Amino acid sequence: MKIKILIPVYNDWQSVFKLLENINSEVSNLDHEFSVIIVNDASTETKPELSINLEKLNSIKIINMKENRGHARCNAAGLKHIFVNEEFDYVIPMDGDGEDRPEEIKQLVDNLNYHADKPIVGERIKRSEGIFFKFCYFVHKIITSTFTGQSIKYGNYTCLPKSTVEKMINEKATWSSFSGALAKVEKDRASISSERGTRYFGPSKMSFKNLIIHSLSIIGVFKINVFIRSILFLLVYLFLIQKNITIVMLIPIILVFGLIVSVFMISKRESLDELNNSLLNISNIDNLK
């Protein structure tokens, strides 16, 4: 099988090169052809020379983008490039900072023996971040499940068959949220248990603002569900409090309306036209191997 590993990067070459070394080690005993596609999101940091021997990787390409578009759109453009220009059977998207553990590639690939035609997702069973992030992630899961009806416990770290990649690049939500789009286009998914690793170098680049945007982008994929469930919630809530309405009791109503507005606003980031034209943002492609 030909498996492409897709890695977005922005100003974190040290981590990516360490990840390449670890991937090379982890796939050494797997009888498949592994290649790596790195999407460089217009990094301003100088890329060092690759001085390590990566004999188990068939090829390594760096797609250099003209303009910075963000992590989700790097993944979308990478999927588009691979589908249009590469020969492959599966794509494994993963973060370039070490938090998606290369040790789990074998689990993903082994599961293809049982789920060859399904996307396989890495469902988080353990996270390495601090207490605040874990709390925010817990709240995100509760809100997502309650207002969308979706249980999305995975991120980018997945193994996608070619048929799923084709669906993803023809879904406008992929331009805004990878995991949300995958949940939308593929209802039947297999999974492995995945532990969130620690960053190889430096602190996390995920700010609280970006965390909120990331969460709303996922929820926004299912904005119609959010609207319907929100209206039902408000009707039930108003019925229950109608005889004893206070200012404090109006707070949940305000929060729900705020959620609806935020979700519909952020869903405007979704764009099939921009996804279709994403390869025009490519400056050049470096072949490291």
Regions from the PLM with identified roles:
Residues 32-43, 63-64:
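Short beta-strand/loop segment that forms part of the nucleotide-sugar
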Residues 12-27:
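Short, well-formed alpha-helical segments that are part of the catalytic scaffolds
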Residues 65-67, 71-81, 90-93, 99-176, ...:
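Acceptor/aglycone-binding surface of glycosyltransferases and processive sugar-polymer synthases
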Residues 225-289:
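Terminal low-complexity segments of carbohydrate-biosynthetic enzymes
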Residues 12-16, 43, 101:
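Donor nucleotide-sugar binding loop of glycosyltransferases
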